[in-house]
């Protein structure tokens, strides 16, 4: 399994490898070049002694290299999660959420690969097979332990992604609450002003008698003072109530 980061997405490449093990032979089948197979082949060509311990030991060499290739992938994902965790607090965006879901999908794909491999290695390390030398079981046991640790790392990374997702949603909700709070305060401060300006701005009738006093200069200044002092008073009152 190989994972490559391409912008905001991750491309997961999974190549199927079939291995047939016999008493004195080992056959591998794969559609694309696999680094672990090529490295083992080159090692056997450089030093023929690598083939003298039996086909089962050669299987161990191949499997060990295959499992070792998971670590760079795990490190890539771990580094990506650290970067996203910083983005969650500094500049969360829909793109951040997309990255979290992509990483979660990649980790789920890795888990589906690790679990069957772990079971196979557990059988090779514990069960009796004619094609497996008992002295080589300890090597397969070592690979099984590596797969167990990789599975645990995978679970830890999935927990980190889930935690980052929860944190992202909390940050977005808090920001939304702050926006709604600000808009509510602005609306509350200007509501009395809207009422006063609307009431004194009505032109439905001509002022007569005592109502003529409403259009005098002193009334204008009184209303203007109320329009200025009322928002200030409401602001001070909200501050004392610790609403701001």
Q: What residue ranges belong to the model's regions?
A:
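Hydrophobic alpha-helical transmembrane segments and their immediately adjacent juxtamembrane loops
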Residues: 145-244
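Peripheral, non-transmembrane regulatory/ligand-interaction domains of membrane transport proteins
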Residues: 1-142, 146-151, 156, 214, ...
